[in-house]
Swiss-Prot record:
Mg(2+) 2 binds at residues 228-229. Its cofactor is Mg(2+). Catalyzes the transfer of the phosphoribosyl group of 5-phosphorylribose-1-pyrophosphate (PRPP) to anthranilate to yield N-(5'-phosphoribosyl)-anthranilate (PRA). Anthranilate 1 binds at residue 83. Its EC number is 2.4.2.18. The gene is trpD. Mg(2+) 1 binds at residues 95, 229. Gene3D superfamilies: Nucleoside phosphorylase/phosphoribosyltransferase catalytic domain (3.40.1030.10), Transferase, Pyrimidine Nucleoside Phosphorylase, Chain C (1.20.970.10). One of its GO terms (cellular component) is cytosol. Keywords: Amino-acid biosynthesis, Aromatic amino acid biosynthesis, Glycosyltransferase, Magnesium, Metal-binding, Transferase, Tryptophan biosynthesis. It catalyses: N-(5-phospho-beta-D-ribosyl)anthranilate + diphosphate = 5-phospho-alpha-D-ribose 1-diphosphate + anthranilate. GO terms for biological process: L-tryptophan biosynthetic process. This is Anthranilate phosphoribosyltransferase. It comes from Neisseria meningitidis serogroup C (strain 053442).
């Protein structure tokens, strides 16, 4: 067993922690056995040294171990559409909009998200703004997935052990390992994923982490300029995990007949209300940059979820889901499912 002090000494000497050591240390932190000042030192040491694939994998495995899981008989076909955040782009909720389009095209989406930390509007903020209930029990989330094809898991409801580290990570003022752990710890166990990251280096790193964690089909993407989505402004780096193997490549909007934009100004928003307005415009079929970026990201989600055979097929399916009105109806179905009785979970707690 490694003590927090031993871990700190290893990290400040620029030495990595072995998998078993990181597992043990993470369990101590998630159990409330490590004082805040030592948590701060550990997170700082990991950031300065740079977290390894092994360290991230161990930490994610422990977070999954401590999570309150969604009880599903079969999670095999589930796909998560999620981003790390931290890109500072202030775009509308692209992945949340894509959730409705993907579900309308036949995907089973188990989306894991929280409130805004660095963006104009977090996934949970916009889901709440549209009138949905964030505080579903795990059983109700499972029922939502079965009935509507969508389940939204508000992160604090499923990661109560984060209360031991959340105040420290918020106070640090810089990214820590926890910024990338959230997207790796889907409580429904979705084996397929479209994961947006804020730096191209993370594409290869997190695809290897998810490979070790047993994921099946994953696209880890980083748009030009550090956007944690597939972008419209140029190339997007993709690390794809499929059939146990990882391949890396670049894609561009014009590869799929979509116009490359000079900037993302058309899809930037100032708050949750503006984000929901932009989402509704897309779901109602309005042409423009917002629709195009949703088409690209939905296509990737459909491909990752094995609903589409390729990204090009995914574009066609996404376009048809919007133009037929099914994507708009899917959103209404999702919001309408939510039970009126609120459950007293940890709804006010933030993961970060």
């Amino acid at each position: 067993m490694i003590t927090p002090q031993q871990a700190i000494e290893r990290l400040i000497s620029n030495n990595e922690l072995f998998y078993d050591e990181m597992t043990d240390l993470m369990r101590q932190m998630m159990s409330g056995k490590v004082p805040p000042e030592q948590i701060a030192a550990i997170l700082t040491g990991l950031r300065i040294k740079v977290e390894t694939v092994s360290e991230i994998t161990a930490a994610a495995a422990v977070m999954r171990e401590f999570a309150t899981k969604v009880p599903l008989e079969n999670a095999e076909g589930l796909v998560d559409i999620v981003g790390t955040g931290g890109d500072g782009a202030k775009t509308f909720n692209i992945s949340t909009t894509s959730m409705f389009v993907a579900a309308a095209a036949g995907a089973k989406v188990a989306k894991h998200g929280g409130r805004s930390v660095s963006s104009s509007s977090g996934a949970a903020d916009v889901v709440e703004q549209m009138g949905a209930n964030l505080n579903l029990t795990p059983e109700q989330v499972a029922q939502s997935i079965r009935q509507t094809g969508i389940g939204f898991m508000f992160a604090p409801n499923h990661h109560s052990a984060m209360r031991h580290v959340a105040p420290v990570r918020r106070s640090l003022g810089f990214r820590s390992i926890f910024n990338i752990l959230g997207p790796l710890t889907n409580p429904a166990g979705a084996p397929n994923q479209l994961l947006g990251v804020f730096h191209t280096d993370l594409c290869g790193i997190l695809s290897r982490v998810l490979q070790q964690l047993g994921s099946k089909h994953v696209l880890v993407v980083c748009g030009e300029g550090g956007l944690d989505e597939i972008t419209l402004t140029g190339k997007t780096r993709v690390a794809e995990l499929k059939d146990g193997k990882i391949s890396e490549y670049d894609i561009r909007p014009e590869d799929f007949g979509i116009e490359t934009r000079r900037n993302l100004d058309e899809i930037k928003v100032a708050n949750t209300q503006e984000s929901l307005l932009k989402m509704n415009e897309v779901l109602e079929g309005r042409e423009g940059a917002a629709r195009d970026i949703v088409l690209l990201n939905t296509a990737a989600a459909l491909y990752a979820g094995n609903v589409a055979a390729s990204l090009s097929d995914g574009i066609s399916a996404a376009r048809e889901a919007i133009d037929s009105g099914r994507a708009k109806s899917k959103k209404e179905e999702f919001v309408g499912f939510q039970p009126q009785q609120r459950c007293h979970f940890l709804g006010k707690m933030e993961l970060g």
